UniProtKB/Swiss-Prot annotation:
This is LisH domain-containing protein ARMC9. Disruption phenotype: Embryos with CRISPR-induced armc9 null mutations show curved body shape, retinal dystrophy, coloboma, reduced cilia number in ventricles, and shortened cilia in photoreceptor outer segments. SMART domains: LisH (SM00667). Residues 586-605 have a biased composition (Acidic residues). Expressed in multiple CNS regions, including the cerebellum, all periventricular regions, and all layers of the retina. The lineage of its organism: Eukaryota, Metazoa, Chordata, Craniata, Vertebrata. It is found in: Cytoplasm, Cytoskeleton, Cilium basal body; Cell projection, Cilium; Cytoplasm, Cytoskeleton, Microtubule organizing center, Centrosome, Centriole. Residues 580-605, 610-629, 642-817 are annotated as: Disordered. Coiled coil: none annotated.
Amino acid sequence: MSFKKSLKMGENLASESDLLSMISEYLKFGEFEETARTFEKEVKRKGKPALKSAGASRRDSKIISIYEDFLSSFNDGDYKVFSELWAKNIPPEIRDFDPVAQKLEFYLQIHFTIYPLKSPLGSHDKAEFDSRITHFRHYLETRGAALSQTTEFLPFYALPFVPNPMVHPSFQELFQDSWMPDLRDRMEKFLTVTLKASNTPRLLALYNDAGKGNKEAIQQMQLQLTEAERKSAVHIRRFAKLQADHHNLIGVTAELVDSLEATVRGKMISPEYLQGVCVRLFSGNMRQSAAQSLDFTRPGTASSMLRASVAPQRPKDVPLLPSLDYEKLKKDLLTGSDRLKALLLQALRWRLTRSLHGEQRDTVLQAFISNDLLERYSNKQKTVLHLIKCKNEIVRQYTARLINAFASLCDGRLYLSQIPALLPFLLDCLKTEEKESVTRENVLAALQKLSLRRAQQSAMIRDGLIGWLVKELNDSDCLSDYTLEYAISLLMNLCLRTQGKKRCAEEAKYVLKVLTELLGHENHEIRYYVNGALYSILSVPEIREEAKQMSMEEILRCYNKEENPELNRQIEFIIKQLNSATIPEQEPESDDEEDEDDDDDEEDVMEADLDKEEVLQPQPKELSGESLLTTEYLGIMTNMMKTKRRSCPPSSRSIDEPLQRPVTPSSHKNTIAGGEGVYPVTRQRSEDSRFSSRPATRTGSRPSTAESIHQTLATDSDCWRSSVESGLMGSPERHVPAPGQTTNSVQSYSGHMVGFASRPKIPRTPDSDAGSAGRSRLPPLAPQFSNSEPQQSGSRPGSAGGSSGRPSQQSSQSNRK
């Protein structure tokens, strides 16, 4: 017998005795006595492990343990533990439909409600009693509603509204010494019958449980398949239309090229020909008759319609979602069952993620904030935020998803930053959750988005998050792409701060080792953040020296031969930083500056991954989502809309240079997507442009900047020239002003700009004179370029482009252009 085969048999022997015992147990259960006796004899004859007769006894011992837990929680008045035991161990067909079980449950609810009043005189816990009264009232409105027409229970529906039940004549019986023992006896008899009723053999139980799980999984997959087919049909229709438009556009373009060639040869284009081309061009977007009735020969008509067809339109007549009773919502989030908590957290998140971008979503968010959904201003010992520490995994996950949704929006981040306990909770959760859990992914994403705010950056650095991130990234093969992207982008954000660089300098060799290994990771999306982190920390002389000892330049040269020219140019910048001989002047400490310098000025982006892989699926006829909120929690005038702070428009960006402001993956992806020639590099924005849709990506918004790197490079004129000249395709010899100078000559930027997406800091309140020109007309079709380089000043580490004072009027005006 081979070693491999014997090893396999040895592994099987460990469970063989259990399997044989289960077969014997099932034969006896089915009254196959003769077969069972023959089976046992053959087991002995073949020398198999002795059959265990502990199947029933093990089951009995488990029942006894459950029975004792019921009694213990009853005697201690622990209604939460008792409720979990009741829901888990009493079969649904008995719990929901058996009259005896329903009546017993009603009296048990009364017992747990008045339990605090039965404590020794003078030690009554009024707050605990109020909490239990709220729970009892919820029970009366839900499961207890079925007994509301029963005379026996009718008086108890007034219990929540009686100030002192102990002295009320209707409830005197409840406080007699005999009432509680009698109820316990009834409960014991019920449990004895109910728990013993399940005498199913383990083999049959395994079969039934497996079938039940498969059935539920099949139902869930069928729902997902139906939804996927619906989305697929929609996308197929859209694709067909886009394909037809594309083919039409190619044909029109070919004709226009022919016309241009004919014009060059001196042949004139007739108005009828132009009219025909324009009718074909617009036939897909309007009725044929309408297209033919327009006079496209009039100068400007066709071009105006083309610009109008791509101009973002503000949504019109978007209905606001109904107001909610937030007080009732918050109570049920604290006192309801775990399933109700999860359903409410899911519904609240969906209200935020599935609302339309613009006024509808702004109103939802402001309603959450103004009604203090996460109980920022509550003095209670336990708040909604504590659900992140709930024992139930789904509740924890859905709390993290909701916090992540808040963090995806600028005002949401502002609200979260005002909750002192939030950051410690998230950091604790990050370090205790399992690596691949969805909860940890959402907590990490929320922290990454909060790192756009300076106060949160400082707190994360103080709490040692940099060390934890580096340790996690050292084992990057065990991380999902989602976790990897957020972890490295969060690390980069923290490394932009002075204190963050100092933390990295404490373990410079280890940090550099981890970052250089990530340069070769198969996920190229993370390269931008790795390069940004390297560029930032290499500004510290101690880290530069350590990098030189590690032969960092040779390592970087190995990664400078890839097909991606943007990443290659970034590597060149890092090498220049590594070889910089100039010791930078003492940088001002940035960690204690005011929040007005937060890098949190991007448009809101609600990522699609917030609603991915929903583990909670509603049961048949169970309310969920918006229907749950509007059916059970309808309120009056709780939607308080206020003017939303406008985010600053994207400004001129050089994408060849390292990221120098805190970023999040989605906005960076939006930035580099624009570098492929799809969008102008810089452009003016109309008032309505804030309503334009943006692609849903992995995360929330992320700012980035180029000005601060220019300011850093200003100390080295060679690096300054390289930073401006590199990557501007077709214009390597254009005049570049020296640092600190400005020029009125127009710089012609040709080609596309991609790579280290970064942009200058823009004041939150732009100068009215400087901004008036940009708001006076709609965005032009052609790109508009800055008339001057940004004015250089002393770089403040981590704030990306801000100086000790505000940028000059000329600089901010050119940035907005």
